[in-house]
Swiss-Prot record:
It comes from Saccharomyces cerevisiae (strain ATCC 204508 / S288c) (Baker's yeast). Present with 2550 molecules/cell in log phase SD medium. Required for the accumulation of subunits 1 and 2 of cytochrome c oxidase complex. Thought to play a role in either mitochondrial copper transport or insertion of copper into the active site of COX. The keyword 4Fe-4S does not apply. It comes from the Eukaryota. Belongs to the SCO1/2 family. The gene is SCO1. This is Protein SCO1, mitochondrial.
Length: 295
């Protein structure tokens, strides 16, 4: 029989199989050997004491403190809440963006008003201006006339506020266009003088009566002048009052009426600009694994 050393905490003792007796206890004969395992208390340490993972025991009247465990749990909860909040914000924002994008996609496919198309006009500097000049940038178009007493000036002032806010707050630049509905009186020089009182980026467009009529027809703009007007006679032109937002592909996006103020108008334009996806990128999205999001 092997002798245990008191300096050891754990010893394996092997005894030959035999029949033992004493104090009424019996050890049945078994084939081979059996192992007896004992824990020996040494150096004042308690067996099976719990020690924090990666740390040292903290003693307080013989008990392990739970402060480190509670602190770790608190940090985990805070991290979980922070990550959860960030993910919730991200997914909600992406959901709104995708919904707007899907709506724009649907408008391209069906149900979109047939607005826009080929036209030929002249700007207030004498340069040719066609629908091709709308490509590559967002444009906003307003139809009016220089002798308009109140509505046109009010709408152009509002457009100036939109342009300033879009540029300074969102870094968005639009191409603002003013197309006259009164080509008989609004020559390039007249438009240049008239628009000098408004935002400097607004470009005036005019043309012959037939050219202006064609442009108005393409955008479904109603306008009329009094019959039998004599040269030099003062008159008013009745016309539709809308801003037409066009995307960089020259496609109609939205029409903003007089109900849009300096804040809601900006919000609507920003929404459309941020949700716009170029044609090449749209084609890639339809082929990607997540294409079901756009259906």
């Amino acid at each position: 029989m092997l002798k245990l050393s008191r300096s050891a905490n754990l010893r394996l003792v092997q005894l030959p199989a035999a029949r033992l007796s004493g104090n009424g206890a019996k050890l049945l004969t078994q084939r081979g050997f059996f192992t007896v395992t004992r824990l020996w208390q040494s150096n004042g340490k308690k067996p099976l004491s719990r020690v924090p993972v990666g740390g040292t025991p903290i003693k307080d009247n013989g008990k392990v403190r739970e402060g480190s465990i509670e602190f770790s749990t608190g940090k985990a909860i805070a991290l979980f809440l922070a990550v959860g909040g960030a993910l919730s914000y991200f997914f909600n924002r992406e959901k709104r963006r995708l919904e707007t994008q899907k709506e724009a996609e649907a408008n391209r496919g069906y149900g979109k008003p047939s607005l826009g198309g080929p036209f030929h006009l002249e700007d207030m500097y004498g340069n040719e201006f066609t629908e091709k000049n709308l490509l590559g940038k967002f444009s906003i178009i307003y139809f009016g006339f220089s002798n308009c007493p109140d509505i046109c000036p009010d709408e152009l002032d509002k457009l100036g506020l939109w342009l300033n806010t879009l540029s300074s707050k969102y870094g968005i630049t639009l191409q603002p266009l003013f197309i006259t509905c009164d080509p008989a009186r609004d020559s390039p020089a007249v438009l240049k003088e008239y628009l000098s009182d408004f935002h400097p980026s607004i470009l005036g467009l005019t043309g012959t009566f037939d050219e202006v009529k064609n442009a108005c027809k393409k955008y479904r703009v109603y306008f009329s002048t009094p019959p039998n007007v004599k040269p030099g006679q003062d008159y008013l032109v009745d016309h539709s009052i809308f801003f037409y937002l066009m995307d960089p592909e020259g496609q109609f996006v939205d029409a903003l009426g007089r109900n849009y103020d300096e804040k809601t108008g900006v919000d609507k334009i920003v929404e459309h600009v941020k949700s716009y996806v170029p044609a090449e990128q749209r084609a890639k999205q339809k082929e990607a694994w997540y294409s079901f999001l756009f259906k």
